[in-house]
A protein has these predicted regions:
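Conserved C-terminal beta-signal and adjacent last beta-strands/turns
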Residues: 773-794, 806-920
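Short, acidic Ser/Thr/Gly-rich low-complexity loop/linker segments typical of extracellular
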Residues: 48-64
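A short, solvent-exposed loop/turn motif at the edges and junctions
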Residues: 46-52, 74-90
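Signature of Gram-negative outer-membrane beta-barrel scaffolds
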Residues: 498, 524-627, 800-805
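Membrane-proximal, glycine/serine-rich, low-complexity loop/turn segments characteristic
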Residues: 21, 62-64, 78, 82-85, ...
C-alpha cells in the first residue's frame, strides 16, 4: 500500500514537472518594406540537436501566430513565405515567450542589397546619387576631374566647369567641407582620383531649404568628394611643370597634410594655356558658402562696371593667370569645435581681338552691323574666408562665418563699328577708346544659432547677417561717330569725350528665424520670419573737359546721385509629409518690400511698394529601391531693380542709350519641374530625366527704338505677357566594367517664346533646340581606353518680324578619345573634338571646328609617381573662338581669339607620405 502511494505521488510530480517544462510561443510576421502583415506564413520549430520538426503553425489574417505546448530547450525557428527570403534564427525556450514582430525581406530586395554591399557602382538614396570611385577605372595620376568625366550624367568642359544630371555644379566639397572657398576647380583639378572613396551629388540647398524641405527649382548641384581614410593620414601633393621654352608655360604645386583631424593645404599655379574657371560665379556675397540666405533686396544695389574677367573670360582671348592660396581646418574635443580658414589670390590678365557680325531684323527690313574689338584687361582678387562652429552639446550649436574680398580691375580697349542699311550702304561708323578702373572691397558676416529639442525633429534656427560693400570706379571714354546720308555720303561727325565715376557703399542687415514642429510621425510644420534692410548710397557722375583741359564740367543728364533705403518683411509656412515611399510638401510665403529712393541731385523722394507671393509644392515618390520620382512647383515674384526703375540715361555707348522706367510692374513666374532617377544594380544601368517649364507674367523686356537715319538705338524696360521657356535633360548609361563595353545616349532640349518691341511693333520669337548624343566606350585597366561620343542637334528660330527668313540649322559635334599603354611604361593618347554647323543665309562664311590634340607619356619612379610627357594641342591649328546668337531682332556671329596650336614638354610628380604606406 505504501509502495502504491509512493508510485502514485511520483507520477503526479512527474506530470507536473512535464507541464512546467512546456511553453507557449507567439509573435507577428510582416513585410519589412511595406510594413504589412503576412497571412499564412509558416512558422516551424526545429530541434537544434537533429533539426527535426518539433511543431509548426501558420499565421492568421492579422499575421499573428501561436505555438502552444512547446517543450523548453534549444531550437531553430524557421519562417517561410512565398517570394520572401527564409528567416532562420536560433531560439532558446525557457518559458512563455512573445518574439514580437519578425520583418521578412523580399528575395529581390535582398539580392539588390547584397549586390549593393559587394559591388554596386552607383547608389541612389533620396536626392543623393553616390558613385563608388574604385568602380570607375582611371589612369595612374588621374585627378578628380578625370574621375568625374567617367561618371554617368557628368560633363566637364575645358574650363573645368561641371554639369551633373543636367545642372551646373556650383559647389564642390571635400568630406563635407569647402576646399578653398568658392573655387570648385581647386578640388577637382588637384586631388588625386586614387584618394577618393566616393563621389556624392545632390541638389544645392541652403540650411533654410534643408529645414523647409522646399527649393526654388533653380538650384544647381553640389558634389561631395569623400576621401579614403588612408588618404587622410600624412601628406600628399603634386608638382607639375610644362613649357615650350618660348611662349607657353603651365605649372602647378599642391601640398596637403593631415595630422589627426587637422588639415593644411597650400597651392600655387602659373599658366598661360589654361586659366581654368578661377572663380565660377562672382556671387553678390562671396564665400559665404551656398547656405547664405539671399534676400529680396539683392537687386537694389548696383555698380558701374561691376563685371570683370573672373566672370566673363569664358575662354575668350589669351590668358595669363596666377593663383595661390592656403587652407587650414581642424576639429577637436569630439568634433564639438570646427574651424576652417582659407586665403586665395587670383590674378588674370587677358588680351583679345574679336569681330561681331550682326543681321538686324527690323519692321522696315534688314540692316547690318559689324563690330571690331581689342581689349587688354588685368584683374586681381584677394579672398579671406573664416568659419567657426561650436556644438555646445547634442542640442545646441553656433556657427560664425566671416569673409573679406578685395578686387581690382583695369581694362583698356577700343571698339570700332559700322551700321549698314539694307543696301549695305554706311549709316554710321564709330571709333571708341576706353580706359576703365574698378575697385571693390566687401565684408560679409553671418551668425547661425541652431537649437534642437528632445522631441524628435523639433528645431529652431536663427541666422543673422551683416555686410558692407564699397565700390570705387572710374573710366575714360572717347568716341567719334561719322554719320552718312541714305546714299552713303558722309554728313557729319559727333564726338564724345567724357570721364565717368562711380562711388557706392551698401550696408545690409538681415535676420531670419525658422521653427520646425513635428505634428506626428508623418507630418511636420515649418514656419519662418525674415527681416532684411539695405542702405545704399550711389554717386554716379559724368564729366566733360573744361577750358583747362580737365574733366570737371558735370553733365547732369548723364549723372545720377541717390540714396536708397530698402527693407522687407517676409514669412513662410510649409507643411511636410514623410511616410514610407512618399514625401510631400505644400506651403507659401509672403513678403512686403518698401523702397525709399532719394534723388540727391533734384532733392526728390520716391517710394515703391511691392507685395510678393511665393506658393510652392513638392512631391517625391520612391516606388522601389534605387528609383526616385519627383515633381516641384514654385511661384516667384520678379520685381524690378533700381537700375530699371530710375529714369537715368546712360550713354556709355552713345549709339545704344539706355534709360529706366519708373512705371514697371512686379512680374510673376510659374515654374514646374519633374525628375526621374533609376539605377538597376544587376544590369549596371542608370537613367536620369529632368524637365522644367516656366511661364512668366509681366516679364520685364525691352522697348527698342532704332533711328534708321543715324543707326542709334534707345531702349528702356517694359512689362509683357506671354513669355515662357522649357528645358529637358535625359541620359541613359549602361555598363562600367573592366574590358566590358559601356554605352548610353542623351536626349536634351530647350526652347522659349520671347516678346519685345522694335520701333513700336511687338516682336515675338519662338526658339527651340533639340540634340541627341550617343556614347560608347571600352577600357582595360593599364592597357587601353577608347570612347566615342557623337551628337547631332537641330536649332529652329522664327520671328514675327522676318517670317520668310530661314534661321534653322543642324549642328554636329562630339569627341573621339583613344589611349593605349605600350611597353616600357609608355602611353600615347589622342583626343578629337569637333563642332560642325549648317550654313545659314545671314552670313557668307561658316565656322566649323575640329580640334585634335595628342600626347605621349613616359611613366617614372616607383608606383608610376612621376611622368614626363610631350603634348601637342590643336594639331590642325583650328581652334577659333566662335559663338552664334539668334534673337527676336538679330542674328549674330561672334568671333574671338583662343589659344590654338602649341607644344609642351611636361613633367609631373605626385608624392605622398602615409603612415604604414610606401613613400613616393
Amino acid at each position: 500500500m505504501l509502495k502504491t502511494a509512493v508510485f502514485t505521488c511520483f507520477l503526479c510530480l512527474s506530470f507536473l514537472a512535464v507541464r512546467a517544462q512546456q511553453a507557449v510561443i507567439s509573435g507577428n510576421i510582416a513585410d519589412s518594406s511595406e510594413k504589412q502583415n503576412l497571412h499564412l506564413a509558416v512558422i516551424s520549430l526545429l530541434r537544434k540537436s537533429d533539426t527535426t520538426i518539433a511543431t509548426y503553425t501558420r499565421t492568421n489574417q492579422q499575421g499573428k501566430f501561436v505555438l502552444p505546448k512547446v517543450d523548453t530547450g534549444l531550437y531553430f525557428m524557421l519562417i517561410t513565405y512565398p517570394r520572401f527570403a527564409d528567416y532562420l534564427e536560433p531560439i532558446e525556450i525557457r518559458g512563455n515567450k512573445d518574439i514580437g514582430t519578425v520583418n521578412m525581406t523580399l528575395k529581390s530586395k535582398l539580392l539588390e542589397e547584397v549586390v549593393i554591399k559587394t559591388g554596386s557602382a552607383i547608389r541612389i538614396k533620396g536626392d543623393t546619387t553616390e558613385f563608388v570611385a574604385d568602380s570607375f577605372k582611371v589612369k595612374a595620376g588621374a585627378t578628380v576631374e578625370d574621375l568625374l568625366k567617367k561618371l554617368p550624367g557628368f560633363t566637364v568642359n575645358s574650363k573645368g566647369e561641371i554639369v551633373a544630371q543636367g545642372k551646373r555644379v556650383d559647389k564642390v566639397l571635400v568630406d563635407g567641407e569647402e576646399f578653398f572657398g568658392d573655387d570648385p576647380t581647386m578640388a577637382t583639378q588637384n586631388i588625386s582620383a586614387k584618394a577618393v572613396d566616393r563621389v556624392q551629388v545632390f541638389e544645392t540647398k541652403t540650411e533654410q531649404q534643408q529645414l523647409t524641405g522646399m527649393s526654388t527649382g533653380n538650384e544647381g548641384k553640389t558634389v561631395n568628394i569623400k576621401l579614403k581614410e588612408d588618404a587622410k593620414k600624412g601628406a600628399f601633393g603634386k608638382l607639375y611643370a610644362g613649357t615650350d621654352f618660348n611662349k607657353y608655360y603651365d605649372s602647378k604645386l599642391l601640398y596637403n597634410r593631415f595630422v589627426g583631424k587637422k588639415k593644411l593645404s597650400a597651392f600655387g599655379t602659373r599658366t598661360n594655356v589654361n586659366a581654368g574657371s578661377l572663380n565660377w560665379e562672382d556671387r553678390q556675397k562671396l564665400g559665404i558658402e551656398n547656405d547664405f540666405e539671399f534676400d529680396e533686396l539683392s537687386g537694389y544695389y548696383f555698380s558701374f562696371g561691376g563685371n570683370d574677367d573672373f566672370n566673363d573670360w569664358n575662354l575668350r582671348g589669351l590668358p595669363d593667370a596666377w593663383t595661390a592660396g592656403t587652407l587650414f581646418s581642424n576639429k577637436w574635443n569630439s568634433d564639438k569645435h570646427n574651424v576652417n580658414l582659407s586665403y586665395r589670390f587670383n590674378r588674370l590678365g587677358t588680351t583679345n581681338v574679336g569681330t561681331t557680325m550682326t543681321q538686324n531684323n527690323l519692321p522696315s527690313g534688314l540692316t547690318y552691323s559689324n563690330r571690331y574689338t581689342t581689349k587688354n584687361a588685368l584683374n586681381q582678387q584677394h579672398a579671406v574666408n573664416a568659419k567657426y562652429e561650436w556644438k555646445l552639446d547634442s542640442l545646441t550649436s553656433f556657427k560664425i562665418v566671416a569673409v573679406y574680398t578685395g578686387k581690382t580691375s583695369h581694362t583698356i580697349g577700343k571698339n570700332n563699328g559700322e551700321f549698314l542699311n539694307g543696301n549695305r550702304d554706311s549709316v554710321n561708323q564709330s571709333f571708341n577708346n576706353y580706359d576703365n578702373s574698378t575697385e571693390r572691397n566687401q565684408i560679409d558676416n553671418q551668425f547661425t544659432y541652431k537649437q534642437l529639442f528632445k522631441k524628435k525633429n523639433r528645431q529652431w534656427q536663427t541666422v543673422l547677417r551683416y555686410g558692407i560693400t564699397d565700390d570705387n570706379n572710374s573710366g575714360l571714354t572717347n568716341t567719334r561717330i561719322r554719320f552718312f546720308d541714305s546714299l552713303g555720303v558722309y554728313k557729319n561727325t559727333d564726338t564724345t569725350d567724357q570721364q565717368k565715376s562711380f562711388d557706392g557703399r551698401s550696408t545690409t542687415f538681415g535676420v531670419k528665424s525658422t521653427f520646425t514642429e513635428p505634428l506626428s510621425d508623418r507630418w511636420m510644420l515649418v514656419v519662418d520670419y525674415a527681416y532684411n534692410r539695405n542702405l545704399s548710397r550711389s554717386l554716379r557722375n559724368t564729366y566733360e573737359k573744361g577750358t583747362n583741359g580737365k574733366y570737371e564740367v558735370l553733365i547732369s543728364e548723364f549723372s545720377n546721385n541717390f540714396q536708397l533705403d530698402a527693407f522687407s518683411h517676409s514669412g513662410n509656412a510649409i507643411l511636410r509629409y514623410n511616410w514610407k515611399k512618399i514625401r510631400f510638401g505644400l506651403g507659401s510665403g509672403v513678403s512686403t518690400v518698401k523702397l525709399g529712393l532719394d534723388d540727391l541731385d533734384n532733392n526728390n523722394h520716391s517710394q515703391f511698394h511691392f507685395l510678393n507671393i511665393t506658393p510652392q509644392a513638392q512631391f517625391n515618390y520612391v516606388p522601389k529601391p534605387q528609383t526616385n520620382i519627383g515633381i516641384n512647383y514654385r511661384g516667384t515674384t520678379r520685381q524690378p531693380t533700381i537700375n530699371q526703375l530710375q529714369p537715368l540715361r546712360d550713354n556709355t555707348d552713345p549709339l545704344n542709350e539706355y534709360k529706366g522706367n519708373p512705371d514697371l510692374k512686379v512680374g510673376f513666374n510659374h515654374g514646374i519641374s519633374i525628375f526621374f532617377n533609376q539605377y538597376k544594380v544587376l544590369s549596371q544601368s542608370w537613367l536620369g530625366v529632368n524637365f522644367s517649364y516656366n511661364i512668366q507674367e509681366n516679364a520685364i523686356t525691352q522697348f527698342n527704338t532704332i533711328d534708321l537715319t543715324t543707326g542709334k538705338r534707345t531702349y528702356y524696360p517694359v512689362n509683357v505677357n506671354g513669355n515662357h521657356s522649357w528645358y529637358l535633360w535625359s541620359n541613359y548609361n549602361k555598363g562600367k566594367g573592366d574590358k566590358k563595353p559601356r554605352y548610353g545616349f542623351g536626349l536634351n532640349g530647350n526652347g522659349n517664346r520671347f516678346i519685345n518691341f522694335v520701333n513700336g511693333q511687338k516682336v515675338e520669337t519662338n526658339s527651340n533646340a533639340v540634340s541627341l548624343s550617343l556614347n560608347f566606350g571600352i577600357d582595360a585597366d593599364d592597357k587601353y581606353d577608347f570612347s566615342i561620343n557623337p551628337s547631332v542637334g537641330y536649332n529652329a528660330s522664327r520671328s514675327s518680324l522676318a517670317t520668310g527668313n530661314n534661321n534653322n540649322y543642324f549642328t554636329y559635334g562630339g569627341q573621339v578619345y583613344a589611349e593605349v599603354e605600350l611597353p616600357w611604361k609608355v602611353e600615347i593618347n589622342s583626343n578629337v573634338n569637333f563642332d560642325l554647323r549648317q550654313h545659314i543665309n545671314a552670313f557668307a562664311s561658316n565656322t566649323n571646328l575640329v580640334i585634335w590634340s595628342a600626347g605621349i607619356t613616359k611613366k617614372l619612379f616607383k608606383k608610376d609617381a612621376g611622368k614626363i610627357s610631350f603634348y601637342a594641342n590643336d594639331l590642325l591649328d583650328d581652334n577659333k573662338g566662335f559663338t552664334r546668337t539668334i534673337n527676336s531682332t538679330f542674328i549674330s556671329d561672334d568671333r574671338f581669339q583662343r589659344i590654338s596650336r602649341y607644344f609642351l614638354l611636361k613633367f609631373e610628380w605626385s608624392f605622398n607620405k602615409m603612415p604604414g604606406g610606401e613613400k613616393k
